[in-house]
Amino acid sequence: MRVDLNCDLGEAFGNYSFGGDHQIIPLITSANVACGFHAGDENVMNETVKLAKAHNVAVGAHPGLPDLKGFGRRNIDISNEEIYNLMIYQLGALQGFCRIHQVKINHVKPHGALYQMGAKDREIASVIAQAVYDFDPSLVLVGLANSYLISEAKNVGLITASEVFADRRYEDDGQLVSRKESDAVITDTDEALKQVLKMVKENKVISKNNKEVTLQADTICVHGDGEHALLFVSKIREILMKEGIDIQSL
C-alpha cells in the first residue's frame, strides 16, 4: 500500500510571509507551488522550487483565481476562456523556474475556489483538464476524489490522482464542507489521523452527518497555511510509516 503526501506551499508574497515551508517540505513527497495569482510571487516561487529540489520532493503547479485579497478562495464570475488562459499563464510561470533549476513539473492541482468550481462543474473541469493536457499531456492532474476534476481529466487522457484531505470535513456526497461553515476545518490531531487512516486503508470517510462515503485516496493533502500544518504533516507521516504504508510521490 502506498500514498502520496502533499502540501500547498510557496504562498507568501512580497513582505507577507506565513507557513512553515522549510520545516514541512522535508516531510512531504509532493509540493503544490502557488503560481502568483492567489499567492506567491517570483521570488517565493524560485525559492520553493529550489527547496523542493533539495529535498527530492515532486514539484506541482498550484494555479488559482486572480484574487490575492481573498487568497483565491472566493468564487469569481469568469469565462471558460479566462480559466483556460490563467491556467496556461501560471503553468508557464512555474515552468520557467523549474527549467532553470532542472526540475520537471510533475503534477497540477488547482487552488481553492478554482478547485471547488472544477470539482462541482463538469464544464469548468473540462476546461481545466484541457489546459493541463495542452500544456503537457504527461502531467498528473490532482483533484477531489469522485469529482468532475478526476472524470474530465481521464476523458482528455490525463493521468489523475484522487485527493483526500486530512484537515477538512466532508459532506454526504463527498464534497468538502464549505469554509463558510464553522466546522469545515479539522484542528484536532487525533481526529485528523483517524480520518487519514480510514481513507487510506479503507477508502472511506465519515461525513459531517456520520455517513460513510467511499473514495479513492491516491494523495493526502494538508493545507500549508493551516495553524496545525507542521504538526499534522509530522504526525501523519509518523502514523503512515508505523502502519507500513509507503509514502511516495505521484
From Swiss-Prot:
Query: What SUPFAM superfamilies would the database entry show?
Result: Glycoside hydrolase/deacetylase
Please give the catalytic activity noted in the UniProt record.
5-oxo-L-proline + ATP + 2 H2O = L-glutamate + ADP + phosphate + H(+)
Task: Report the enzyme's class at the first EC level.
Answer: hydrolase
- Secretion signal: which residues? none
**Record-level Gene Ontology MF annotations:** 5-oxoprolinase (ATP-hydrolyzing) activity; ATP binding
What is this enzyme's EC?
Answer: 3.5.2.9
Spell out the InterPro entries in the cross-references: Glyco_hydro/deAcase_b/a-brl, LamB/YcsF/PxpA-like
- TM region positions: none
Name the GO terms of the biological process aspect: carbohydrate metabolic process
Superkingdom to which the source organism belongs:
Bacteria
Q: Per the record's keyword annotation, is ATP-binding included, yes or no?
A: yes
Alphabetically ordered keywords of this record = ATP-binding, Hydrolase, Nucleotide-binding
Keyword RNA-binding among record annotations: no
Report the protein's function.
Catalyzes the cleavage of 5-oxoproline to form L-glutamate coupled to the hydrolysis of ATP to ADP and inorganic phosphate.
Tell me the protein family, please. Belongs to the LamB/PxpA family.
Q: How does it assemble?
A: Forms a complex composed of PxpA, PxpB and PxpC.
Name the UniProt record assigns to this protein:
5-oxoprolinase subunit A
Native source species: Staphylococcus aureus (strain bovine RF122 / ET3-1)
